[in-house]
């Protein structure tokens, strides 16, 4: 995949070249999307809109730390949707990992989560965030046990994953109507990079065959159900639905 690669570390150690080789990235000086290695982290920038800033994965500080410490925990909609109850903490495959936010919430309340991400740039961002998270004194121990990244296309990987998870979680890219600054910023950068999930409808059936208990699909409240398969079961929040489908028992 072609992208502009920029090293701002000043280290001169070739770390960016190693990273590019690992993820199959090719430097393109004229590309409007840039993957930038800074002294702190790896980030994605839209070069023609510098005011948007950089997008990076941070499980240790910022919004994710606040959500972990002060968020709803088991009361969060995604936790309810996957079926967390009492001692039941399902094993989850997040087949559309993105920046890993929902996967991190589930891991922070005790679920083991395998994240799938097919875009190599997004996978590199996730891997960078995980490396920093694993090294953190406060969360590193449980994060290594509970949150893993698999760089693969969900459409192919969903038929290969073993052991089977109890839950498959899907949050396909869907055009956002919201005007919130964060959504606008991230979505504009993200959609410039990966575009809409045009093949997302093809995920529902393999997800239902893989999950032993249920499939959870996050949708904006105005979006039709995935693959136009309606379900009466959903956890509804302001702005979103978590549609719930039966999996395939062992």
UniProtKB/Swiss-Prot annotation:
Pfam families the record matches: SAM_MT (PF04445)
Residues binding S-adenosyl-L-methionine, per UniProt: 101-102, 117-118, 153-154, 171
Record GO terms (molecular function): rRNA (guanine-N2-)-methyltransferase activity
Entry keyword annotation includes Transcription regulation: no
InterPro entries assigned to the protein according to its UniProt record, in alphabetical order: 16SrRNA_methylTrfase_J, SAM-dependent_MTases_sf
Gene3D superfamilies given in the database record: Vaccinia Virus protein VP39 (3.40.50.150), YhiQ-like domain (3.40.1630.10)
UniProt keyword Lipid metabolism, yes or no: no
Bridged cysteine pairs (disulfide): none
Catalysed reactions, as listed in the record: guanosine(1516) in 16S rRNA + S-adenosyl-L-methionine = N(2)-methylguanosine(1516) in 16S rRNA + S-adenosyl-L-homocysteine + H(+)
This protein's GO CC annotations: cytoplasm
Keyword list, A-Z: Cytoplasm, Methyltransferase, rRNA processing, S-adenosyl-L-methionine, Transferase
PANTHER family in alphabetical order: RIBOSOMAL RNA SMALL SUBUNIT METHYLTRANSFERASE J
Protein name: Ribosomal RNA small subunit methyltransferase J
Gene that produces this protein: rsmJ
């Amino acid at each position: 995949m072609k992208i502009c690669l920029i090293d701002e570390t000043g280290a001169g150690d070739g770390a960016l070249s190693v990273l590019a080789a690992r993820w199959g990235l090719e430097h393109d000086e004229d590309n409007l999307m840039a993957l930038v290695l800074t002294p702190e982290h790896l980030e994605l920038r839209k070069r023609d809109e510098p005011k948007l800033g950089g997008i990076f994965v941070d499980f240790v500080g910022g919004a994710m730390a606040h959500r972990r410490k002060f968020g709803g925990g088991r009361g969060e909609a995604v936790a309810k949707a996957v079926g967390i109850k009492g001692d039941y903490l399902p094993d989850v495959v997040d087949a559309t990992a993105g920046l890993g936010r929902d996967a991190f919430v589930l891991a922070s309340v005790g679920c083991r989560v395998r994240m799938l991400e097919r875009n190599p740039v997004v996978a590199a961002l996730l891997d960078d965030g995980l490396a920093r998270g694993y090294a953190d004194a406060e969360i590193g121990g449980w994060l290594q046990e509970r949150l893993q990244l698999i760089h693969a296309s969900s459409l192919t990987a969903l038929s290969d994953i073993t052991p089977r998870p109890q839950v498959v979680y899907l949050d396909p890219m869907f055009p956002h109507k919201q005007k919130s600054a964060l959504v606008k910023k991230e979505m504009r950068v993200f959609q410039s990079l990966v575009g809409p999930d045009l093949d997302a409808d093809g995920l529902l059936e393999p997800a239902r065959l893989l999950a032993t208990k249920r499939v959870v699909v996050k949708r904006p409240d105005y979006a039709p159900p995935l693959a136009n398969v309606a379900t009466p079961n959903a956890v509804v929040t302001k702005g979103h639905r978590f549609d719930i489908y039966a999996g395939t028992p062992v």
